[in-house]
């Protein structure tokens, strides 16, 4: 989303589970692997990545309803698509996903959330495959979730997940989604080259939001090359032209150092 990044040794798009498992079994176990979702929360180096980038294809992009209140979604399904599917099936609890521009797999990996809700609030279980091709199912109660993280192994590739909603009415759900959308558009930049919130809120250290700390500590007109701080939300950094990876890292480091100095 920053429109920044270099090349990798191998880029592999898996069309289905069988192909993915076969590919993993052929890889050297020491090979570095990076799973690319929507790329909406990713800053990629301009340097060559000496490893394998894997992206899951269309057969990991299915959504289905099981029973009255359980949804099964592939890991490359967009968060927005899951929220809309839930609304169509009169299930609430997924409205917050409308504000997250990522995939189900990425959302689980970082326990993504907004508007006071997180993935762990709706997750029942995940299906994943490890680096050597073993497919496993993990119940959410076996996962230790924290703010924007969990204890799942970095070696796992998420395939799909099951979620539980609450029966409601589509018009009520739609009204809530419209309210959240308006709130997001009012407070956050959209349709620009950004990767969303850069820093996590320091929930264990202060009640202040990270944007408040940045606003109090950093000259907001600071830039490096074409890497800028958003005028609309100072925890959003923007590529206004041809910013490089180094430009963005310099801006991130500059903001972090100034906040640490003054708090």
Go through the PLM ranges and name each one.
Residues 1-104:
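Anion-binding (especially nucleotide phosphate/pyrophosphate-binding) glycine-rich loop
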Residues 2-5, 28, 35-36, 44-47, ...:
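Solvent-exposed alpha-helices and their adjacent loops that cap or buttress functional pockets
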Residues 42, 129-258, 262:
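Phosphate/pyrophosphate- and phosphate-bearing ligand-binding catalytic cores of soluble enzymes
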């Amino acid at each position: 989303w920053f429109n920044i990044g270099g090349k990798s040794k191998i880029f592999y798009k898996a069309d289905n589970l069988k192909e993915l498992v076969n590919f993993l079994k052929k890889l050297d176990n020491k090979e570095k692997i990076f799973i690319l979702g929507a790329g909406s929360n990713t800053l990629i180096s301009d340097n060559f990545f000496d490893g394998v980038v894997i992206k899951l294809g269309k057969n990991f992009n299915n959504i289905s309803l099981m029973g009255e209140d359980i949804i099964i979604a592939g890991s490359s399904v967009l968060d927005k698509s899951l929220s809309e599917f839930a609304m169509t099936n009169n299930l609430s609890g997924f409205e917050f996903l409308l504000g997250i521009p990522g995939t189900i797999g990425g959302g689980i990996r970082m326990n993504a959330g907004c508007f006071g809700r997180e993935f762990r609030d709706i997750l029942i279980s995940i299906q994943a495959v490890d680096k050597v091709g073993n497919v496993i199912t993990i119940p959410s109660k076996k996962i230790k979730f924290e703010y924007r993280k969990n204890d799942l192994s970095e070696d796992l590739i998420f395939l799909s997940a099951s979620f539980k909603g609450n029966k409601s009415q589509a018009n009520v759900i739609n009204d809530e989604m419209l309210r959240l959308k308006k709130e997001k558009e009012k407070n956050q930049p959209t349709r620009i080259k950004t990767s969303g919130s850069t820093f996590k809120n320091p929930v264990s250290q202060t009640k202040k939001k990270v944007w408040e700390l940045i606003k109090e500590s950093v000259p907001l007109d600071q830039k490096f090359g074409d890497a800028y701080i958003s005028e609309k939300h100072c925890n959003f950094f923007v590529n206004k032209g041809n910013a490089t990876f180094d430009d963005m890292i310099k801006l991130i480091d500059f903001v972090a150092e100034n906040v640490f100095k003054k708090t």
